[in-house]
Amino acid sequence: DGGMSAQMNQYFSYFLLHFFRDMDLYQQQQPLKQWKVQPFRPASSFRVGILGMGQLGAKLASHLQSYGFDVAGWSRSKKQLPGVTSYAGANELEPFLSRTDALCCLLPLTPDTLGILNRKNMGQLPKGAVVLNAGRGEHLVADDLLALLDENHLRGAVLDVFKPEPLPADHGLWLHPKVMMTPHSSAQSEHVPCVERIG
């Protein structure tokens, strides 16, 4: 994969640790000059769910276990990965979402996955969950995400892909305080490894 899986692991690890260690809350406290330690929680209580268990998703699932997180994956068919709870198909999407504190989307774009990050599905996540999308911009219904953030159902979102790209300057995602954005840079092809693989 030309080093893309390692980059993707780094990307998701950075942001998942950001939320797990309550860095977003500390950032909110700082301008208010609040000295408040957030309660400790074990890593095993942080339930990560990966939408899309292809090559990148499977490698991410294995990598995240090193932090002690409770990792599950959802895909079209059951996957067998040590230490990862597997969900598959439309009937198991709701139970997968309802147990997920941090949803990581790495799905391919198909007619079945178009708009999968919508109000109905994201609303099945527990209150205070976070959504991270590095799949495709078309997976996300942006207005639904913004509404769930404003209603405080979702704690935050990390977005690397958008529809369209680049995102228009007047889009509501840009300045939302609970949204962190990157310009489709979660994983980039490394020229040398790709050339070596082809040659």
Model-found features: residue ranges?
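Rossmann-fold NAD(P)-dependent oxidoreductase module
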Residues: 11, 15, 59, 63, ...
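Rossmann-like adenosine-cofactor binding region
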Residues: 78-172
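Gly/Ala-rich phosphate-binding loop of Rossmann-like dinucleotide-binding domains
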Residues: 61, 65, 149-150
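Short beta->alpha connector loops at strand-helix junctions that form conserved
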Residues: 1-3, 135, 184
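NAD(P)-binding Rossmann-fold cofactor-contacting core
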Residues: 66-83
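Glycine-rich NAD(P)-binding loop of Rossmann-like domains
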Residues: 26-59, 86
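Phosphate/diphosphate ligand-binding glycine-rich loop within oxidoreductases
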Residues: 1-27
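Adenosine-phosphate binding glycine-rich loop
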Residues: 167-168, 175-199
